[in-house]
Curated annotation (Swiss-Prot):
The keyword Ion transport does not apply. It comes from the Bacteria. The gene is calB. It comes from Caulobacter vibrioides (strain ATCC 19089 / CIP 103742 / CB 15) (Caulobacter crescentus). PROSITE patterns: ALDEHYDE_DEHYDR_GLU (PS00687). GO terms for biological process: aldehyde metabolic process. This is Probable coniferyl aldehyde dehydrogenase. InterPro entries: Ald_DH/histidinol_DH (IPR016161), Ald_DH_C (IPR016163), Ald_DH_CS_GLU (IPR029510), Ald_DH_N (IPR016162), Aldehyde_DH_dom (IPR015590), Aldehyde_DH_NAD(P) (IPR012394). The lineage of its organism: Bacteria, Pseudomonadati, Pseudomonadota, Alphaproteobacteria, Caulobacterales. Transmembrane segments: none annotated. Its EC number is 1.2.1.68.
């Protein structure tokens, strides 16, 4: 639903809280949904994506100014259907109680049982971002619905056409007691994050996440925060530079680098920096013979983000960096209908440059040389823990050393970003890059309450062990057996 306009944050909160209370009441009234009901919810989501593919591509293109339908279908549509299908296929197995051994084990021999029962939390709030506005709404819902929850969604105000479309889509397939969408600006988001959800998922900037977490803390709402950071690429001396550059630049130019997992900077052996630059230029020329009117090359979403990314380049240039714009056709991009920034390499970057201090979130890639791989590891560890780390090479011992000595949300070896597509792996950050994880079974677990259930023996053995007053020799023997090394 649309959040009413011209309302205070408190008024917005009251409107949304009414829906929240109705969803919670419906959850209690209906009880935990069956596997069939959960599959029905997932199927409705899949049907929405399949049936609105063209409309989604049109809306996203309108919001970005230029993004090809193929890019949107790949990342936002197909990228959402995959997780939903995976959850649909496996949720019946996931829902089964998890059997555990009893403590002490002898209790189990006589019939006692210890299990974990997976219980829906209730109502989950989802705050989705602008960079993949459809995928980062539907992908969390795969776990939310598999776990048997209802959902309230606040899509980004920076992609208004897509947000309005999402609102209309969900209204066609779900009633408000199942899913409700609220569209609006920061005041709506502020009110939304302060609701007493049973769980809240936020995907976006670390700076905003602090406000979201603070608001959620007022109601002790557990949160999953999917944030970002400066995800490094470490190129080993054994890396194939042509392959590495092609894969890094593919990840860096996808959605014009507006991806939380985009490679943020490259650490390369000093003697290989120029080879990487040459191969990066060749790869971009293959991918994008032209940029200005090429729909395959995505625009930056808004003027303030365009100015921010251009500001990083200007700051680096002013502080002595070598700046290489990869513009295969030599087009004049100073006057253009859309906000396109060509892939840009920043060589000889220093830590006083903004491009090395802040997440870039655009098609700009600093390349920094190193003498030893330990130097590269130390550089990564001297900064905030990133959402992802990428290593390219053939030396298994070096790979293991890098992965053991660095901490990141996830890792892809010999490519970038692809670990996010693995539904059998958790996706999440650590530290400033986020907390919690979802995707596949991990999403089911994240959005479920793990209820511990112990079923005692029918026969009362406590008196036999002397565990009840008045205490005597029986309990002393029992304790003597327990309190020892």
């Amino acid at each position: 639903m649309n959040a009413p306009v011209n309302l205070s944050s408190d008024a917005h909160k009251a409107v949304m809280n009414d829906v929240l209370q109705r969803q919670k009441a419906a959850h209690l009234r209906d009880g935990p949904p069956s596997a069939e009901k959960r599959i029905q919810w997932l199927n409705r989501c899949i049907d929405l994506l399949v049936g609105h593919q063209a409309e989604i591509a049109k809306a996203v293109n309108q919001d970005f100014g230029s993004r090809s339908p193929e890019a949107t279908s790949l990342t936002d549509v197909a990228g959402s259907i995959g997780p939903l299908k995976h959850a649909r296929e496996h949720l019946t197995k996931w829902m089964k109680p998890e059997k555990h051994k009893t403590t002490p084990a002898i209790l189990g021999l006589f019939g006692a049982k210890a299990t974990v029962q997976w219980q829906p939390k209730g109502v989950v709030g989802v705050i989705s971002p602008w960079n993949f506005p459809v995928n980062l709404t539907f992908a969390p819902l795969a776990g939310v619905f598999a776990a048997g929850n209802r959902a309230m969604i606040k899509p980004s105000e920076f992609t208004p056409a897509t947000s309005d479309l999402l609102k209309a889509m969900f209204a066609k397939a779900f009633n408000e007691e199942e899913v409700a969408v609220f569209v609006g600006g920061p005041e709506v988001g502020q009110a939304f994050s302060g609701l007493a959800f049973d769980h809240l998922v936020f995907t976006g900037a670390t700076s905003v996440a602090k406000h979201v977490m603070r608001a959620a803390a007022e109601n002790l709402v557990p949160v999953t925060l999917e944030l970002g950071g400066k995800s490094p690429v470490i190129l080993s001396r054994g890396a194939d530079m042509a392959t590495a550059a092609a894969r890094v630049m593919n990840g860096k130019t996808l959605n014009a680098g507006q991806i939380c997992l985009a490679p943020d900077y490259v650490l390369a052996p000093q003697e290989d920096v120029e080879a990487f630059v040459k191969e990066a230029q060749a790869a971009v020329s293959r991918y994008f013979p032209t940029i200005k009117d090429n729909p395959d090359y995505t625009a930056v979403v808004a003027q303030r983000h365009y100015d921010r990314v251009k500001g990083y380049v200007d700051d680096a240039r002013a502080k002595g960096a070598r700046v290489i714009e990869i513009n295969p056709a030599g087009e004049d991009l100073s006057q253009q209908e859309h906000r396109k920034i060509p892939p840009t390499l920043i060589l000889d970057p220093t830590d006083d440059m903004k491009v090395m201090q802040e997440e870039i979130f655009g098609p700009v890639l600093p390349v920094k040389g190193y003498k030893t791989v330990d130097e590269a590891v130390d550089y990564v560890n001297a900064h905030d823990r990133p959402l992802a780390l990428y290593w390219f090479g053939t030396d298994e011992a070096e790979k293991d050393r890098v992965l053991e000595r660095t901490t990141s949300g996830g890792v892809t070896v010999n490519d970038v970003i692809f670990h996010v597509a693995q539904e059998n792996l958790p996706f999440g950050g650590i530290g400033p890059a986020g907390m919690g994880a979802y995707h596949g079974y991990d999403g089911f677990r994240e959005f479920s309450h793990r209820k511990a259930v112990f079923q005692q023996l029918k026969k009362d053995i406590a008196p036999m062990l002397g565990l009840r007053p008045p205490y005597g020799e029986g309990i002393r023997k029992y304790l003597a057996g327990q309190i020892k090394k």
